[in-house]
Amino acid sequence: MKNKFVELVEKSQLRTDLPEFNPGDSITVNLWIKEGDKQRIQAFKGFVLRKRNRGLHSAFTVRKMSSGMGVERTFQTHSPLIDSIIVEKRADVRRAKLYYMRGLTGKAARIKEKV
């Protein structure tokens, strides 16, 4: 059980501008990257492999294929480094964690789109 003051501070840090998404959805995460003294936005496009809902400590993992290699990146949902999240496609999956997708390639790695 958390202290009421801690809960109040955490509640003020939560972001409300992010869209709702689920595992399997194809999303683009635009995040701020700092290189030296310059800042720019970099896009990471892939599908949501897993989502962890823990209030301020929520996180999600996005997987994409880059030059034939699978790349996974975990983001903190309420991070100030995330500029925006764009949901490209909604998926119809029956699992909460899509770890089995790591071993699939080609046509086997397709996800059914929600109609």
UniProtKB/Swiss-Prot annotation:
According to its UniProt entry, one GO biological process term is: translation
Instruction: Write the protein's name.
Output: Large ribosomal subunit protein bL19
Native organism is Francisella tularensis subsp. novicida (strain U112)
The protein's matches in InterPro entries, at most eight in alphabetical order, are given as: Ribosomal_bL19 (IPR001857), Ribosomal_bL19_CS (IPR018257), Ribosomal_bL19_sf (IPR038657), Translation_prot_SH3-like_sf (IPR008991)
State the protein's purpose.
This protein is located at the 30S-50S ribosomal subunit interface and may play a role in the structure and function of the aminoacyl-tRNA binding site.
User: What keywords sit in the KW lines?
Assistant: Ribonucleoprotein, Ribosomal protein
What PROSITE patterns does the database record attribute to this sequence?
Answer: RIBOSOMAL_L19
Gene Ontology cellular component terms for the protein in this record: cytosolic large ribosomal subunit
Q: Does the keyword Ribonucleoprotein apply?
A: yes
Q: Which PANTHER family match?
A: LARGE RIBOSOMAL SUBUNIT PROTEIN BL19M, RIBOSOMAL PROTEIN L19
Q: Which family does it belong to?
A: Belongs to the bacterial ribosomal protein bL19 family.
